[in-house]
C-alpha cells in the first residue's frame, strides 16, 4: 500500500479541488482494506504536514473504495497508510450531499450524554455490535484544501467520526464492546479471533 500512495502523489502537481466521486455502491474497492488481525490497524497515524494533490487524490480513492464496500466511513490506516485522514458520508443515499474529508481531526469537546448503538466496520466485515459513545462532539480539522475548520456533530455523524478517529490511534470498535460473550460469538461467526481484540480499559 505504500507504493499506492507514491503513485497517488505523482498523479498531479497542481493545487486543484478534489473531483466529485460517484456514490454508486458497485464494483470492487480500488484500495485494499485491511482486516482485523493485520498489524497496520494497530499503529498510530501521523499528522499530515502539507495538504496537496497527493492527499486529495488519496481521499478521492478512499471515497471510491468506501462507497464500493458499502461503508459510511474510512480511515487511511485501514488501507495501510499511516496518515491522519478520514472520509465520511452518512448521507450516502443522497447523491447531492457532499462527503466529509477530515485531515488531522481533533475532538475538542465531548457531550455528556452517552448512547449505545450498533456499529460495524469495513475492517471487520459482518460483525455488528453495540458500542457506547458520547452523542455529541465538537472538533477541528483541515479540509481537502488545507483550510482550518470547526464543526459540531451529533447522532450518527458524531458516532462515525469517533469510530474513524479511533483508527488513527490503532483502536477498533470491537475494543470498546463491553459484552465479551456477544463479541466472541460474532467474531467466531465471521472467522475472526478474539485474541486480536485489545479491550479499552
From Swiss-Prot:
Protein name in UniProt: Peptide deformylase
Function: Removes the formyl group from the N-terminal Met of newly synthesized proteins. Requires at least a dipeptide for an efficient rate of reaction. N-terminal L-methionine is a prerequisite for activity but the enzyme has broad specificity at other positions.
Domain of life: Bacteria
Membrane found in the keyword field: no
Cited InterPro entries: Peptide_deformylase, Peptide_deformylase_sf
Top EC class of this enzyme: hydrolase
Name of the coding gene: def
Gene3D superfamilies for the chain: Peptide deformylase (3.90.45.10)
Cofactor binding mode and count: Binds 1 Fe(2+) ion.
Co-factor requirement: Fe(2+)
